[in-house]
Amino acid sequence: MRRHPQLYEVNARIFLNRLSSTAGHRVTLSTIPDQAWLELAEKGFDLVWLMGAWQRSSAARQRALSLPGLRHEYDSVLPGWSEDDVAGSPYAIYSYSLDPPLGETTELAGLRDRLNRLGMGLILDFVPNHLALDHPWVYARPQLFLAGREEGRHLHPDWFFSPDGNAPIAHGRDPYFPPWTDTAQVNFYSAELRDALVQELLAIAGMADGVRCDMAMLGLNQVFQRTWGDVLAEPSMPGIEFWDEAIGRVRARNPSFIFIAEAYWGLEQTLQGLGFDFTYDKAFYDCLRFCGASEVRSHLSSPDFNLSKGVRFIENHDEPRVAAVFG
């Protein structure tokens, strides 16, 4: 792979829905026409990020249908939408198995092999900070999630939910926004939780060439402490960072496995130091969108972090379409 690979994001569900509509029958990962991938290879892309491949949550979907703010958003982006159009968030993961509408989980390794033959690699999502609020672990292994001190729960009752009337569990969140109420927050201070996440990563490494890690900085000890300090029951943080442990264990078996971090808040260099191959360069996007040429040049000459490891983009699923922003 090139030192500076080109990454192409594909919304898995939309992509397959369009192919199925064109073909007049259901298309799954293994029946995607070769031409679809050839076109990307011929355009010079090295990696395909299949966004939203994992099984979504029925409870998260119901939450997505019930929130007035989200329904207003649907009206804006898809006038005339129906409930069948709402699949729920791809980042409230019920299981690290292929979402059934996309095919069978075994098709992922087959897709990776097809892409490899064309000189490309497959990138899949990994969401370390939280799982769907109805994930099986919520009921079978609740100790993996953040329960917090009772005083903290009284202080922030909207941060917690009680699955089926059981002990409270926190919703996933970052320190600057309200919680994601379709999720359950994992406890990064738990050795058992860390091992469980590493096992998921090792399984993904058998199906893909790398992972794009959602909100990767939320797994840092200091960030977890800052986010949850009001409610944490554990008196002290672990002696090792989760990412140092996780990346080391995965690379011991899969030395070339790629780790890409969605990262903000000036923590890109920290994550690179823990083993990430690439980290988001959101500052570059913001310079392009809101500043002038001199600011862009200044950013590109900054010593703040290794620019060769920056992921630069002009759009992704979190940002407006490029034509709407840059014309």
Question: Where in the sequence are the language-model features?
Answer:
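Active-site and adjacent substrate-binding regions of carbohydrate-active enzymes
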Residues: 1-327
